A protein has these predicted regions:
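Membrane-embedded helical hairpins/re-entrant loop segments and their flanking transmembrane helices
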Residues: 20, 46-86, 277-351, 476
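Juxtamembrane interface elements at the cytosolic ends of transmembrane helices
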Residues: 2-7, 38-42, 46, 187-198, ...
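N-terminal signal-anchor module of multipass membrane proteins
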Residues: 1-88, 96-108
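Membrane-embedded alpha-helical modules
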Residues: 106-225, 357-471
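Intrinsically disordered, low-complexity non-transmembrane regions of multi-pass membrane transporters
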Residues: 1-25, 228-264, 299, 304, ...
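Membrane-embedded hairpin module used as a gating/binding unit in multi-pass transport
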Residues: 38-39, 215-220, 224, 231-322, ...
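Short, non-helical or kinked segments that cap or interrupt transmembrane helices
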Residues: 61, 82-97, 141-150, 204-210, ...
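Hydrophobic alpha-helical transmembrane segments of multi-pass membrane proteins
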Residues: 28-35, 123, 147, 178-182, ...
């Protein structure tokens, strides 16, 4: 009888096993929603660290990123001891770390050693977040929606400039900002918007992936009809001939093997306090973000608040997963807000269905040709998708902030935290006279100061006379009163 109940479960049941004909497409739907976002941070940071596009190392890292996302997703869904929230949450490489990782890479010399420092710091930071997750219950009161929303919003704002940089072909490319790069990025962005809002079902929730495929086709056709090289004068006055940044090198896909066992420790770790301190602070920030995502899943998909056990297990999974990711040369893992939004939209909360998506990600991590195909993506194609992805993070933050009425207290928290955070992120030169350690922590992306100010202001500002719930109830009552008239 129990088996029958499990087999007749629906996608809207948290537990049980729906028929595979339903579970497989629903699981793949979640993979498609996060596939590009899972690999984008790695493409950006490896570029900053001077790891060649399409190189054997970058392909191995992308391969591992897919593998780790699948493994950590399964841990989050089914748990190992206290680790995991036992909720339908998809895990993947965190975009929130892009800013601080870029700062660390530049400080360490923008080479492979910089990437090694990021990995060592991520391993330690993951252990730190795991411990933080174990003590989350007494700390939960410090992370209301106004704080988590401000953090998510600051992450989105800090990433938009990164997306625009890729949109133009990559800020280090000799042909950065060329009409061809801007044309490619614009086409990809327009296709994504058209598919997302002009279609339904598969094409709508896969709009980013399909937009990138269109970008690949577009640059391939452009390479057939337009010149693929150009000349420019470098800083020394020499005339250089170079390949345009939007041209794809298909030979790297042809050279990649069909199957390979993922490599452990593909990059040598470098332990340096200049990397460890800011990245550990960023793990506090991402813990706040994960609390918001878990709350979004339970409230949007299950119609209830998250329990302390779910929040604690979810944050601990973030930490353990990030430490595991570092062992495989991958950037920190966290819950994916895109998938939280998908669950809230379609109410599909079945863990078995989403677990199938995790298994698919693990399978993808075993095929280097797929990783090679992604590694040769032109920056302008990536930028067209990144602008959309990073902007959606901004909207997620706004939705969290406006979850309850914006009281004067909450307005102060949001405005001061964003003002200081975004201001320092966009004009870090104001900290030039301070010690390097302060610059590295607070001048990288603005996320850390925004998070710290939001948390501190939430603690020290007098509480509102009316609670958020009471204010919301008053507004609902007023609306009903107006409707009755």
């Amino acid at each position: 009888m129990e088996t029958k109940e499990k087999n007749t479960a629906t996608p809207y049941d948290l537990d049980g096993k729906p028929p595979l004909k339903l579970a497989i497409p629903l699981g793949l739907q979640h993979v498609l929603a996060m596939f590009v976002g899972n690999l984008t941070p790695l493409l950006i940071i490896t570029g900053v660290c001077g790891i060649e596009s399409g190189s054997e190392l970058q392909v191995a890292l992308l391969q591992n990123a897919m593998l780790i996302a699948g493994i950590v997703t399964l841990i989050q869904i089914y748990t190992i001891g206290p680790v995991g929230g036992k909720l339908p949450i998809v895990m993947g490489t965190s975009s929130g770390f892009i800013g601080v990782c870029r700062s660390v890479a530049v400080t360490m010399g923008s080479g492979v050693a910089g990437y090694g420092a990021i990995l060592a710091a991520s391993f330690i930071g993951g252990l730190f977040e795991t411990v933080l997750g174990g003590f989350l219950k007494p700390l939960r009161k410090f992370f209301p929606a106004v704080v988590t929303g401000t953090v998510v919003l600051s992450i989105g704002l800090s990433l938009i400039s990164v997306g625009i940089g890729s949109f133009g072909g990559g800020s280090t490319a000799p042909d950065y900002g060329s009409l061809e790069n801007l044309f490619v990025g614009t086409v990809v962005l327009v296709v994504i918007i058209a598919l997302k809002h002009g279609t339904k079902g598969f094409t709508s929730f896969s709009s980013i992936l399909l937009g990138i495929i269109v970008g690949y086709v577009l640059v391939t056709v452009m390479a057939m009809v337009l010149p693929t090289t150009f000349t420019y004068v470098d800083e020394t006055g020499a005339t250089i001939e170079a390949t345009k940044s939007w041209v794809i090198n298909w030979s790297k896909v042809a050279d990649a093997s069909w199957f390979a066992i993922p490599k452990i420790m593909p990059v040598k770790w470098v332990f340096d306090a200049k990397a460890i301190v800011p990245i550990c602070i960023m793990f506090v920030v991402t813990a706040v973000e994960t609390v918001g995502d878990i709350s979004g899943i339970t409230e949007g998909g299950l119609g209830r608040e998250a329990t302390d056990k779910e929040l604690s297990g979810g944050v601990m999974c973030d930490g353990r997963g990030s430490s595991l990711a570092a062992v495989f040369g991958v950037l920190p893992n966290t819950s994916f807000s895109q998938n939280v939004g998908l669950v809230a939209m379609n109410k599909v909360v079945n863990r078995y269905s989403i677990g199938i998506g995790g298994i698919f990600l693990i399978a993808c991590g075993l095929f280097p040709k797929l990783a090679a195909l992604i590694s040769i993506m032109p920056q302008s194609v990536l930028g067209g998708a990144a602008v959309m992805m990073f902007s959606s993070i901004v909207i997620s933050g706004i939705q969290l902030i406006t979850k309850w009425p914006l009281s004067p207290r909450n307005v102060t928290i949001v405005s001061v935290a964003l003002g200081v955070g975004y201001g320092l992120g966009s004009n870090s030169a104001v900290l030039a006279q301070l010690p390097e350690s302060i610059n590295l922590i607070f001048g990288g992306s603005g996320i850390v100061p925004a998070a710290l100010f939001a948390i501190i202001l939430n603690i020290i500002l007098p509480k509102d006379e009316k609670t958020e719930v009471e204010m919301a109830e008053e507004i609902l009552a007023e609306k009903k009163k107006m409707e009755s008239k």
